[in-house]
Amino acid sequence: MKRICKTLFLLTLIGFTGCDDATSLPPYTSLVYLEDFEDLQDNTVLDIDGFSNIAETGTTLWKEQLFDSNGYAEFLSETDNLSAAWLITPPIDLGNTERTLHFQSAQHHMPQEGSTLEVFIATDYNGTDITSAHWIQLQAKTPTIYTEWYKFISSGEINLSGYTGKVHIAFKATHTTTGSGYYIDNIKVY
């Protein structure tokens, strides 16, 4: 019996030492910014500390919304046929490391082309005047009129490697009719 146990132990040991060691884990990247909109007050104008919420056309602003225990930012044009507003993050310090932006977005009741959700980045936003900053549009996947209503989709990984130091990320929603909306959730920079 001892001999069988010894043999079994040695075979097991040989099996483990014969494994390929080429498996490696991807490098760890720390999260430098997260906004999941979970600590908010439902159906109020979005006023999270550090964010800018600016109506460019019309009077519609981004709102704080809560549905089924999930918080998110919503741009819903209820009164203005043509409206546009910017939701701008607080400054995010990217440091000197290559970073990635990711977020989720959804739409509802988009009746026609012309309504858009765009994402921008700036290194020179002063916190109040959107026209004085140099905004660069980022290529992100955002919902279209063909995206299922209320279904959050991934933006994809947006490479921010061309940027260092402090930046602001802006979400600009434009509507050409009332009753349609965009949602933003889970903004992450890592």
Task: State the predicted function of each range.
Residues 33-77:
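Extracellular glycan-recognition surfaces and repeat-rich motifs
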Residues 141-190:
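Terminal, low-complexity interaction segments
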Residues 104-141:
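Extracellular ligand-binding interfaces
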Residues 37, 89, 96-109, 117, ...:
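Extracellular beta-strand-rich recognition modules
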Residues 79-100, 153-157, 183-184:
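Short beta-strands within extracellular/lumenal beta-sheet-rich domains
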Residues 3, 13-41:
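Bacterial Sec-dependent N-terminal signal peptides
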Residues 1-8:
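Bacterial N-terminal signal peptides that target proteins for export
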Residues 73-85, 144-151:
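Extracellular beta-rich ligand/substrate-recognition surface
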